[in-house]
Amino acid sequence: MRALDIAGTGMQAQQTNVEVISNNIANMTTTGFKRQRAEFQDLIYQNLRRVGSNSSDSGSLLPSGAQVGLGVQTAAIYRINEQGNLQQTGNTLDLAIQGNGYFQVTLPSGETAYTRDGTFGLSPEGQIVNTNGYVVAPGITIPTNATGVTINTSGQVQITLDGQTAPTTVGQISIATFPNEAGLDAQGDNLFLQTSASGNPVTGNPASPGFGSTLQGFVESSNVNVVTEITDLITAQRAYEMNSKVITASDEMLSTLTNLH
């Protein structure tokens, strides 16, 4: 009985849906996290009577066919890249991007990774690094005798030194955008890598055309909406239960049919 397999695909799809929702809820306080959404599509159809076929009686064209779908499958899990709320931290090295763009960090392998998490600090060498100790590109060093650090909305990093009143520029933070952000490969640790699907990164200074601006002393909160996630969770749970009831009903029908023989 096909209904057993069809309902099974429905349960698998909703299990994936619940896993995505669970991950969203788990990361509701993760800095720079973007919620995800599972998308589904129907499977192939079995033709009981092909659309556009001729009637065996009169030879006339039948106005409709008889097709039975074979279930559902996960088509994609999209990342919703809506802006998260900005949270003030009081840390002068923390940065939030308001608008488009990703910070760039250099991995130990030399590869560049991308992130919306602007929780930054200093390495023992005085370089600006993320929470994993990866250097924020293009690599900016703050001298030990600096008494203050200012990062403007354009990503320009300036310091104040002892005995000086005028600030000194020590670097420029650049950010990157992609033709297709959905094509980025999530690595964990709030990091992404480019892929052939994302396209090559386009880098530029914050607040320039096409790029968001940087805000010092802030980080971007997760864009997860708990009310939305709980609503989606209830919907997915009910859909899972309905599919399980189809399996139960189909099994009972199959048992009845077997007993007739």
Describe every region a protein language model picked out.
Residues 1-261:
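Amphipathic alpha-helical polymerization modules
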